[in-house]
């Protein structure tokens, strides 16, 4: 059958944005084999997410296209995670435009829809220019999406307060967000006069979302119903919660993974799993506090830690803890979290990690760094009650001991596990045949099937 439609998929190639977008595209492509999906991202991103270990199979109607990452010749990464993002965003509109023209030339089929990471707000202008629908995908939680929609109002309401007063205020004027304080907000949201490309990107996104045909969200209806319904009714956004996108069914279990083998030897709910994502690790003093506490208490642990970060661990720590702990440079996180030996997940509270902890019924110790992570951590502790945050946002030996004992050994920790268990069942129900996320996916698929009809 000749393809009748051509969807341009524009990815944001940093953090864990591109992988869930590809998961969604792969599912759409399987359900709509007569649609071409041209997937645009940077070459390094494509190499990573199109690896055969990440998905069971990639649809034959999905074709990846590499776009320039925007970094100047001879660029050397300074360590600031915002730096490569801003280079990419500066060049992104022209780069994506050129790449889409190449895809049209290759396929002989004009673009009939733009499916993009929600960060790429300029896709709204592209879609208007060529007269096709724009469907942004928000890969984080509904709570953080809502905050970006209300950026101007939040800035206006807090303008009269000084810094100390702001810190005590909550976002009680937006339904479902009364637990969020000003100090939890993403830095880019509150930087009113910032000329940061990333801050401007997020602001523009919030202003452009009303132009979307639908907004697909990597979440499920039952976790934030008040927020989702508010976005639909008050902001007139066609929110389609279609998550969790990354489930065990969408990843291949490693056949011979050393950390999974090690977990099989551990007692149920006894192991601390530590991973802070792919972008940043705690500073050296916090790494030392974590390590010292784990060693002194002899708490079994599995730590996903890149080789270059191990220099911040106490000398000979790995050797001294080898009988009850394990450090690996990479871990298959979903399969680790589903193992019954895991008792708690020490995490930065990125949304993918938070969703995975819910889907695998593991309570959380949150140490957020930037972006939506502080918002997620607040929801984890005070709204969903499935974990605890680190006081002051800093691991000390005393604080590490407190949070580990709270989650692993106290009645409060048992309540957290019960709460996350209830959320897990709701997440599982959402992706069942008649679940809310499945119905929303079918609504999204129907929008694609209407293309060129």
Curated annotation (Swiss-Prot):
Catalytic residues as annotated in Swiss-Prot or TrEMBL: 17, 117
Residues binding UDP-alpha-D-glucose: 139, 331, 333, 348, 351-353, 356, 372-373
Annotated SUPFAM superfamilies: UDP-Glycosyltransferase/glycogen phosphorylase
Keywords from the named record: Glycosyltransferase, Transferase
GO molecular function: anthocyanidin 3-O-glucosyltransferase activity; quercetin 3-O-glucosyltransferase activity; quercetin 7-O-glucosyltransferase activity
InterPro entries: UDP_glucos_trans, UDP_glycos_trans_CS
First-tier enzyme category under EC: transferase
Matches recorded under Pfam families: UDPGT
Keyword Transferase recorded: yes
Keyword Transferase on entry: yes
Pathway noted in the entry: Pigment biosynthesis; anthocyanin biosynthesis
Known catalytic reactions: an anthocyanidin + UDP-alpha-D-glucose + H(+) = an anthocyanidin 3-O-beta-D-glucoside + UDP; delphinidin + UDP-alpha-D-glucose = delphinidin 3-O-beta-D-glucoside + UDP; pelargonidin + UDP-alpha-D-glucose = pelargonidin 3-O-beta-D-glucoside + UDP; cyanidin + UDP-alpha-D-glucose = cyanidin 3-O-beta-D-glucoside + UDP + H(+)
Superkingdom of origin: Eukaryota
GO biological process: anthocyanin-containing compound biosynthetic process
EC number, as in UniProt: 2.4.1.115
Family: Belongs to the UDP-glycosyltransferase family.
Described function: In the presence of other necessary color factors, this glycosylation reaction allows the accumulation of anthocyanin pigments. Anthocyanidins are the preferred substrates, while flavonols are only a minor substrate in vitro.
Name of the featured protein: Anthocyanidin 3-O-glucosyltransferase
Organism: Gentiana triflora (Clustered gentian)
């Amino acid at each position: 059958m000749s393809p009748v439609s051509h969807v341009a998929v524009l990815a944001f190639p940093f953090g864990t944005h591109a992988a869930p977008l590809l998961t969604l595209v792969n599912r759409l492509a399987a359900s709509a084999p007569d649609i071409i999906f041209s997937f645009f991202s940077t070459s390094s991103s494509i190499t990573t997410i199109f690896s055969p270990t990440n998905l069971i199979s990639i649809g034959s109607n999905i074709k990846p296209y590499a776009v320039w990452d925007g970094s100047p010749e001879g660029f050397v990464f300074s360590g600031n995670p915002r730096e490569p993002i801003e280079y990419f965003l500066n060049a992104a509109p022209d780069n994506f435009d050129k790449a889409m023209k190449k895809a049209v030339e290759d396929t002989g089929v004009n673009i009939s829809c733009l499916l993009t990471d929600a960060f790429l707000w300029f896709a709204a202008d592209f879609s208007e220019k060529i007269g096709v629908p724009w469907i942004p995908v928000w890969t984080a939680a509904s709570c953080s999406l809502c905050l970006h929609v209300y950026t101007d109002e939040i800035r206006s309401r807090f303008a009269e307060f000084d810094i100390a007063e702001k810190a005590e205020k909550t976002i009680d004027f937006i339904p479902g967000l009364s637990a969020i304080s000003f100090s939890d907000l993403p830095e880019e949201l509150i930087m009113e006069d910032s000329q940061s490309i990333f801050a401007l990107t997020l602001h523009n996104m919030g202003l452009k979302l009303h132009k979307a045909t639908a907004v697909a969200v990597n979440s499920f209806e039952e976790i934030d119903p008040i927020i989702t319904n508010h976005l639909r009714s008050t902001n007139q956004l066609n929110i389609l919660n279609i998550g969790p996108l990354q489930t065990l069914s969408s990843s291949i279990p490693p056949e011979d993974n050393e950390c999974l083998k090690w977990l099989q030897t551990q007692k149920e709910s006894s192991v601390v799993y530590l991973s802070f994502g792919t972008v940043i690790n705690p500073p050296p003093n916090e790494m030392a506090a974590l390590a010292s506490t784990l060693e002194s208490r002899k708490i079994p642990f599995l730590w996903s830690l890149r080789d270059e970060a191990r220099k911040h661990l106490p000398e000979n720590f790995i050797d001294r803890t080898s009988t009850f702990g394990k450090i690996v440079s990479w871990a298959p996180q979903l399969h680790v979290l589903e193992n019954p030996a895991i008792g708690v997940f020490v995490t930065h509270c990125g949304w993918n990690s938070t969703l995975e902890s819910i889907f695998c019924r593991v309570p959380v110790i949150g140490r957020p760094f930037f972006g939506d992570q502080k918002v997620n951590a607040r929801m984890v502790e005070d709204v969903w009650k499935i974990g605890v945050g680190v006081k002051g946002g800093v691991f000390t030996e005393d604080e590490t001991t407190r949070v580990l004992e709270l989650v692993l050994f106290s009645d409060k920790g048992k309540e957290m596990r019960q709460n996350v268990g209830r959320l897990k069942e709701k997440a599982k129900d959402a992706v069942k045949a008649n679940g809310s996320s499945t119905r929303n996916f079918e609504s999204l698929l129907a929008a694609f099937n209407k293309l060129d009809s």
